[in-house]
Amino acid sequence: MSEWVEQRLQSLAKAFDQSYCGAIEAVVDLICQRFQAGNKLLICGNGGSAADAQHLAAEFVGRFHFNRQALPAIALTANSSILTSVSNDYTYDIVFSRQVEALGQPGDILWGLSTSGKSTNVLHALKCAKDKGLHTIGMAGNNGGLFQEFADYPLFVADKNTPCIQEVHLMTYHHICEQVESRLFAQKSVGIKV
């Protein structure tokens, strides 16, 4: 068991190289600026990434480390009526872009999540967001996959192992939540500085 833990920790440490950590800080800056300007964060993904989208939105709307004002974040994965009606009446490929079309405003942020970087519906949402003047964050494995074309702020894990990618994603968005919360509300961060 300890050998497995050691190998996993080495894989995670390797994923957090200097360029990836710099990209994380750029995303923190973007989210802080956009929240301060009154914009919102839209988040989407499929499967485990859908759960991550909801988790991430909950950290911003609820709280991460301390009580504070709610921050405007919406998981586009959470409304089963929208997801099923758009899938049924149109196609699953546009379940997120349709919501970006309805909810996104220039200056807002769309954060697309995918371990593969090939999720068609997330790609459509990223393209729609760019067309509407939203900032785009692409979080994916496999060096970004097809997300490379549409992500203004790439958070691409240089790994093909899905569990490793998901673990890096979790650590990344927890760090981002912590840093945004601490910067916007002038509280001392309790986490590890990267």
UniProtKB/Swiss-Prot annotation:
Regions annotated as coiled coil: none
SUPFAM superfamilies: SIS domain
GO cellular component: a single term: cytoplasm
Entry cofactors: Zn(2+)
Catalyzed reaction equations: 2 D-sedoheptulose 7-phosphate = D-glycero-alpha-D-manno-heptose 7-phosphate + D-glycero-beta-D-manno-heptose 7-phosphate
Entry EC number(s): 5.3.1.28
Cofactor note: Binds 1 zinc ion per subunit.
GO MF assignments: carbohydrate derivative binding; D-sedoheptulose 7-phosphate isomerase activity; zinc ion binding
Gene Ontology biological-process annotations: carbohydrate metabolic process; D-glycero-D-manno-heptose 7-phosphate biosynthetic process; positive regulation of DNA-templated DNA replication initiation
Amino acids binding substrate: 46-48, 59, 88-89, 114-116, 119, 166
Keyword Cytoplasm: yes
One Pfam family from the record: SIS_2
Cytoplasm found in the keyword field: yes
Superkingdom of origin: Bacteria
Binding annotation for Zn(2+): 55, 59, 166, 174
Keywords attached to this entry: Carbohydrate metabolism, Cytoplasm, Isomerase, Metal-binding, Zinc
Enzyme class: isomerase
PANTHER family registered for this protein in UniProt: DNAA INITIATOR-ASSOCIATING PROTEIN DIAA, SEDOHEPTULOSE 7-PHOSPHATE ISOMERASE / DNAA INITIATOR-ASSOCIATING FACTOR FOR REPLICATION INITIATION
Function: Catalyzes the isomerization of sedoheptulose 7-phosphate in D-glycero-D-manno-heptose 7-phosphate.
Extra remark: The reaction produces a racemic mixture of D-glycero-alpha-D-manno-heptose 7-phosphate and D-glycero-beta-D-manno-heptose 7-phosphate.
Protein name as catalogued: Phosphoheptose isomerase
Organism of provenance: Synechocystis sp. (strain ATCC 27184 / PCC 6803 / Kazusa)
Lineage: Bacteria, Bacillati, Cyanobacteriota, Cyanophyceae, Synechococcales
Gene this chain is encoded by: gmhA
